[in-house]
Amino acid sequence: QLLKAYRSASAATGIDWTVLAAVNLVETGMGRIDGVSVANAQGPMQFLPTTWSEPGIGNGGDIRDPWDSIHAAARYLVRRGGLQDIRRGLWGYNNSAHYGKAVLHYAALLKKEPLTYRSLHQWQIHYASSAGDLWLHEGFEEPQPVSVTDHLRRRPYSAPPR
């Protein structure tokens, strides 16, 4: 179903499906991390409710619905200039050069070999944090945001290699 949503959103907006899949991967491991961020970002594409409610972005859809949020992400990337310069669009999505680089890296992998999608969809989550890179294993779920320090105390196996 995710692949259909990426391709549908791509057809509707012109944003490459691989970029949408890569954003979804970086944001929530393609929906496997289900929670609200410390910044209050929500859903599979991690929208702030204020961004979601901008005219033409959420369009009355459900912030937690993969189909709705993937289409909203495509519209948001267009609004932020992604059709002219995808790096600029990604900067508008998350103002981090590392974020954009990671998304474009995964998008390039998907473009080179579309079957990579299957392995990325079922992979452990690699998460860049203030403490370094963490591994979030499949099924990771917290009802409330958790600080990196608390996460590492509870799950030391997620710690970055030293």
Where are these regions (language model features)?
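Catalytic glycan-binding domains that act on GlcNAc-containing polysaccharides
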Residues: 1-134
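Low-complexity, Gly/Ser/Thr/Pro-rich intrinsically disordered linker/tail segments
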Residues: 115-162
